[in-house]
Amino acid sequence: MKLRYEIWLPHLKFTLQTMSLNYPLNPNEVTIRKYYNFIQNLPIFFPDEPMGNYMSTLLDEFPVAPYLNSRRSFMKWVHFLFNKINKKLNLRTVTFYESLEEYYQH
């Protein structure tokens, strides 16, 4: 039995947004590598195999590596990623600034 995305996806989004908002302004190579490995391994832990496979596809199509050089670019990548997931699930997409407003109202 798979866990419904309505249960786990908001928590994943909150976690990744929190990580991106606290990402270093000027990360060093060790930090970049650790974040890269974390993001690349996320699909393994998705409680819904089709969504995990979709996440793997997104990571192949839109790799995180070029966006790990600054906090702002990582934040924008996380936002972009969740809009892709929302489209796949026929959920509402939001602008970058709307996503920040929603985060801080959480």
Give the ranges of each region predicted by the language model.
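Aromatic-rich, lipid-facing transmembrane alpha helices and their immediate juxtamembrane interface loops
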Residues: M1-H106
